[in-house]
Amino acid sequence: MTATKHTTIEAARETLDRAVERLLALQHPDGHWKGELETNVTIDAEDLFLRHYLGLLDERTATATATWIRSRQRDDGSFATFFGGPPDLSTTVEAYVGLRLAGDQPDAEHLQRARTAIDQLGGLEATRVFTRMWLSLLGLWSWSTVPPLPPEQMYLPKRAPLSIYSFGCWARQTIVALQIATTLRPVRPVDFTIDELARGTAAPRPLLDRILHGYARHPLRPLRRRALRTSVNWVIDRQEADGSWGGIQPPWVWSLIALREYGLPLDHPVLAKGLAGLDTFTLEDELGRRIEACQSPVWDTVLALIALLDAGVERDHPAVARAAEWLVAREVTIRGDWAVRRPKLAPGGFPFEYANDNYPDIDDTAEVVMALRRSGVGEDAADRAVAWLLGMQSSNDGWAAFDVDNDSSLPRRLPFCDFGEVTDPPSADVTAHVLEALGQEGRADDPAVRRGLDRLLAEQEADGSWFGRWGANYVYGTGAAVPALAACGLRDHPAVRRAVAWLTSVQNEDGGFGEDLRSYRDPAWRARGTSTASQTAWAILALHAAGSDGAVTEAAVRFLVDTQTPDGGWDEPFFTGTGFPGDFYLNYHLYRLVFPVSALGRIVNGERAG
């Protein structure tokens, strides 16, 4: 070992110790971790819209939420979908309307700037369908021009190309709620207009939209009534224990609206439970009041547990034991929508959220398997999880997030599907995490694993990287793929060497790695961006798994050492999580800590072992 490398390792060890101390301090007494999950101001504005419709919006809530929304405005008056991102029309319109609803006057300087931005971005008519649905709820747009979602869709065979089960679970839940809403067309008018945002030129409506509107005007009445009731029952049946629908904001708020418009009173147990649960997603501090679009306690906890184990914390440490036991208790033991395509498969998955029994996810389950095996807790639960993972392999040999073979191209062509990704095809990053778990299980020679490896290798980009569906972006995908290949005995595969060469070529001058979320729409941004702690850690994890602990890795480690904050963490305002590529992004506030701990832990302990 060179003197320089020895110095770097010693500095990494000190940095790691501080980070571990910080991570342990953030653990909840029952053993779990939960970091803030930051998104964009549409979630906060829509909370105001929901509460206005339900008659529950009070001045304090409106004022505190408006404070947060104003703090996110860009200098040019617009709002973005992620920190440092470009202006986004629909986000800016929803923020503008939310601020008006909170009492901000149209002649206020910040709203004048927002209006200018909206005009430059295309005006009110160019907003997404989802935004126009919210405006229709407030009486600021007409439901008659919004694409309807016929509840009769519920009667399509489950395996039909456009059945609700051909949509990803997040879209499926939202669409069923919107079947009710677009049929009943709820409106609670606000006391202002937004005519100043309109240009007066609407885009032509596609043929399918016109057909759906034609049927909506003249439906088969008895069938429509039965279908509406079927949609209502489907929604009610899928409410989770915490009051949510899928643990995520879009189906949650639209389910509340749909059920209220259908006639359920606010004190109905379903609505009361849903509203009470929504309050637990509220954060308020000196920056204002904001809503989490989702909460990620299982994901945060399993990543934190793996990080501690990577850092050398012993499995009998109380923090490790508490975390593992908490995870075991989150096992999903019932069949959810995934059983539509796997009716004979026994349950065994784990959710992302506190409560999501209907939709356990494959990514979390793979990570939980690795964490439980290493912690020596929950062996039976891990066995069931492995069986469930093997059973959830898609026909293209990869793994998706929630479903099997949910990859039809038809749903995204529908006129109301412009609010983000609506299907759940297998992705390289989820496939990689499953393969890493199965490789650690000693199953590298299983036929299912070999097929999965072939799938992962086939998805490598020409430059040596992998696309990241659930994290930003090619750095994330590559950071997942290389450890998976190594875990399955392919560390010396040419694909791994190409990945190392690619990572070497995209390292920033400061030693870190960064990738702007614009890379999802513009290839020029691939692996380009300000260095972040989480993305640098992903690169280190890949390089270390590949056996490449030379100058590139050393510089990346030095970046983490040099940028650590006094509290043992790292500053990271940049979003490195992905909800819908190109449309919706996430800033997991624990990513900036758990991934550096894992990366530094593997480097430091690798040196010790060597």
Please annotate each region the language model reported.
Residues 1-610:
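Preference for long, amphipathic alpha-helical scaffolds in soluble/luminal domains
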